[in-house]
Amino acid sequence: LECRFLSFLKLFLFFNIFFGCFVDIYYLCRRAPLSATTTMEKNNLISNLKRYFGFTAFKGQQEEVINNLLKGNDTFVLMPTGGGKSLCYQLPALIMEGTAIVLSPLIALMKNQVDAIRQVSENDGIAHYLNSSLTKAQVDEVKNDIQNGRTKLLYVAPESLTKEETKEF
């Protein structure tokens, strides 16, 4: 897992340095891949789409991307602003075991993403972010929610990855 995570981190840095653009890089740490190829599983995917996001159908390549992630495949997605990238990593994170890590350089975007997920959930701990804006007490709350299995999505600022307490966690 560590080697694959470092590959994603390198991809994140490559886009930010060479293309001068900010991108969210999604890394899904999972024990076992899922498959969403049967009709029943496809219906389950659609029902989860409606449950979490209120949509009855995917747009563009979202379903293909999500199925690829659910199968445990590394997936690179390049879509325009408003193309539905966030849903491509949020839905798999919400329906699979474990916590998904999203690297994002923009604190405001992290907050918006977390707020949006929390609006559709009964559990405020379902999504968190770790960045320089948090107090020690808030960081402890985030870590507690992750350790207790309440958090499905964790948005992390790249600079947070260099802190010893984050590395140890």
Predicted regions, residues:
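Generic detector of intrinsically disordered, low-complexity, polar/charged segments
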Residues: 1, 17-18, 51, 79, ...
